[in-house]
Amino acid sequence: MTRSYKDIAQFTAGSHISRIQQSADGPAFRFYATEQFLVDDWQSAFVSAEKEQWVKTHQDVVLAQKGDVVISLIHGKAVRVSTENAGRILGNNYVKVDVDDSQINAAWFLWHFNESPEGRRQRIQTTQGSTVVQRIAVNELKNFTVTLPSLAQQKAMGGLYLAAREKRFYQQRIAALSEQQILSLLSGMI
């Protein structure tokens, strides 16, 4: 069955960071930035706390919660927010996706958006901007179409997709650590 994204999910654009009004006595929030996105996408293991930006505000802002599906409009990828990155402000380069669990599995949505030929084709067709900075428009995103398999099949595929991403991350991490160890041993031989 073919459906549009807007029929199976709700999309909430991130907060406009420049429009957040700061208040000295407001609760403090950190921002969900590229570093956090890459960690949630199994591409990085390190986040530099030195670069962290904080804001204190009483204003309503869009916060990422553990397990949320978030799409980076700049990277053109979807991730699931980790425990470590929960409670951060999503800026306007991100869109929070609340999938209808009765129709679609969140992990399968990640696979469909990131990896499926159907999702890739639509991302390429709707990307706007120069070759330097490309961006997906939220309204275009809502009109993406998806061919839905059964929920059981979605759960199986989504689980395999997440397991494969995690496995690849740890394999690359082990390879990098092994290379570091070998280079360190070689340096010690001189």
Q: What positions do the PLM features span?
A:
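Basic, amphipathic alpha-helical recognition segments used for DNA target recognition
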Residues: 5, 96-147
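Sequence-specific dsDNA recognition surfaces
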Residues: 6-20, 36-66
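Compositionally biased, charged N-terminal/linker segments
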Residues: 25-40
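A short beta-sheet element
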Residues: 73-113
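Non-catalytic DNA-recognition/assembly elements of restriction-modification systems
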Residues: 1-28, 148-190
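Short, surface-exposed loop/turn microsegments at beta-strand edges and helix-strand junctions
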Residues: 21-29, 48-49, 62-64, 81-93
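Generic structural signal for buried aliphatic residues
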Residues: 68-71
